[in-house]
Amino acid sequence: MVAHLTEWGLRHFTSDTAYFAWQRQTVSAADLNRLHACIARKQAPGAGTAEETAFYDATAEPSLIPALYSQRYEYYLAIAPRVDARIGSARRILDFGCGIGILTTFFARRHPESLFVGVDRSSASIDYASRRAAELRLDNVEFHRIDVDREAVSGSYDLVLATHALLQAEQDPGIPSDRWESFARGGDVARQTAFELRTGLAPRLDRLLTMLADQSRMIVFEKTRLLARRVPFQRALAARGLRLLEPPEPVRYALVEEVADDGPLYVLGRPVQGSGIDWSEGPEEVDADTVNVDSLRGRPGSGEDPLYENHTAAAQMLWQSLPDRRVMKEFTREGQDGRQLHAELGTTQDLVYLYVANTFDQRQILLIEEARAGVLDCYFAEIEQG
């Protein structure tokens, strides 16, 4: 994959300073300004398909490609081998939302006996992908401009790939849990339908599934690591008869210096009844950390750093198991849309704790000695004031 990315002009950076210095050398200020204007229009209230397509057309400008896509260098290193290892005996592969074709052409090179068809709504991306495929002398890949939200793709396929394409509504928080104490979500059909429609997931999935041949598979990798997005996404897949063929795989990679916890990677199919792996709607398993209050006693503390903190789903279990837990003050705030935020300040033996939870699955617990209880008291006040 490294050689392939090099041919595309991409470079690997681990320093933001070095990356942005190179970006300034290779991209004109005028081009960056035009791109930023496209981003602003795409993110503006009321923006839709036209603004999103215009943004992706802009990112397919040849002078921008090396700098822009080098930010995703480690994303390609993480995803390409995982998908490549699962292509197997598939002979007709559809790459939905292929963009400029970096991954599509890599897979076509690796599997010359198979036909790869890349589709995308951005005409500029498709034009560039087609030119690159010709330059790479690939005769087993083709690219077509198709907006799957509105148009069908002809033919049937043994394998459908969708990486960062099915659920592009990154700003959509998903569906909240029933209460701040729980990670569970009830089976509200109206909320599920609304999620699928406002994110565009329903029409995309429905059209893609018409192209799956018998015993064919889907490999899907979307930004659904947060449970509030993962649960409705999985429910949409399950409602259409898709089952897991292997356990989902969360993936971590770097966007230069920023760490991205992404995915999971799903391998899906329509196996015979009774086979496949059951869906899980619980939080990701984390190390079952425990708090030994006795071990924290007498530990030196300084400044505003707590003696202990946990920001994972395990914080709820730790909070529930605190010995001699006594609440000093608490509040639960509920919005008009039903979202809840709970914060609680209390004591556990001779330590002070702060616990925060909301219906978007965020959990946080902090412990500090009584002498510095004011640190958590101030934090509690900030949360309460909103």
Identify the meaning behind each predicted range.
Residues D188-T193, Q215-E222:
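Conserved beta-strand signature within the Rossmann-like core of class I S-adenosyl-L-methionine
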